[in-house]
Amino acid sequence: MKKSIRFFIVSILLSPFASAQVKDFVIEPPIKNNLHIYKTFGVFGGKEYSANSMYLVTKKGVVLFDVPWEKIQYQSLMDTIKKRHNLPVVAVFATHSHDDRAGDLSFFNNKGIKTYATAKTNEFLKKDGKATSTEIIKTGKPYRIGGEEFVVDFLGEGHTADNVVVWFPKYNVLDGGCLVKSNSATDLGYIKEANVEQWPKTINKLKAKYSKATLIIPGHDEWKGGGHVEHTLELLNKK
């Protein structure tokens, strides 16, 4: 009887931790040949949200664009990628400094994997006492790795002062990161570090510069379908 009571008490004490656990990452079917979206999950304000991140398979290895929201999933994602593609992760590019993007770069730094972030992102990471990247992103410059190409671009402030997007010219796909809201979003989400005055101007720059994009991936929630950029402007106009 005492054993049963003790088990009951322990179960009650542990229940908040169980409820705080989030779902494991999900790798979506490839959207374009070697280009993949993977979704991770995190809790903000007591509600679970999904984050859309990407990876590119090259002949030299896999390039991650942002990291899982939960650090506990870093190794598992790398193992899954290695098993699925028979290639290691060779580089990580962070689109801004938050946990669902840059996360803890020390994990990758310690494994000898090159990590990339802008000088501004590194400034924020350092200010928060977090590891900075081993390499500085040169925005607007094409990166060519193992037969694949992409460009990391800074168009202006929006969700944060350091948010960048990633353009894949071979596939006409733009990773909008948290600068772009999903067509299913009901609000702008976390805006304590946002520049809501500059954000619409930045989005209009994105529309003009990447008008050839056939797919634009928002940072969170549903990524399929279109209208993400237009919906972002609608949400900003309500602010």
From Swiss-Prot:
A beta-lactam binds at K181. Residues 1-20 form the signal peptide. GO terms for biological process: antibiotic catabolic process; response to antibiotic. NCBIfam families: bla_class_B_core, bla_subclass_B1, blaB-IND-MUS, blaIND. It is found in: Periplasm. Binds 2 Zn(2+) ions per subunit. PANTHER family: ACYL-COENZYME A THIOESTERASE MBLAC2 (PTHR42951:SF4), METALLO-BETA-LACTAMASE DOMAIN-CONTAINING (PTHR42951). The class B beta-lactamase family has a specific amino-acid numbering system known as BBL, for standard numbering of class B beta-lactamases. A multiple sequence alignment was used to derive a consensus sequence and then the consensus was numbered taking into account insertions and deletions. This allows use of identical numbers, e.g. for active site residues, despite differences in protein length. UniProt always uses natural numbering of residues, hence there appear to be differences in numbering between this entry and some papers. Zn(2+) 1 binds at H96, H98, H159. GO terms for cellular component: periplasmic space. Pfam families: Lactamase_B. It comes from Chryseobacterium indologenes (Flavobacterium indologenes). Class B beta-lactamase which confers resistance to the beta-lactam antibiotics, including penicillins, cephalosporins and carbapenems. Acts via hydrolysis of the beta-lactam ring. Has penicillin-, cephalosporin- and carbapenem-hydrolyzing activities. Its EC number is 3.5.2.6. It comes from the Bacteria. Monomer. It catalyses: a beta-lactam + H2O = a substituted beta-amino acid. GO terms for molecular function: beta-lactamase activity; zinc ion binding. Zn(2+) 2 binds at D100, C178, H220. InterPro entries: Beta-lactamase_class-B_CS (IPR001018), Metallo-B-lactamas (IPR001279), NDM-1-like (IPR050855), RibonucZ/Hydroxyglut_hydro (IPR036866). This is Metallo-beta-lactamase IND-1. Inhibited by chelating agents such as EDTA. Not susceptible to inactivation by the beta-lactamase-blocking agent clavulanic acid. Coiled coil: none annotated. Belongs to the metallo-beta-lactamase superfamily. Class-B beta-lactamase family.
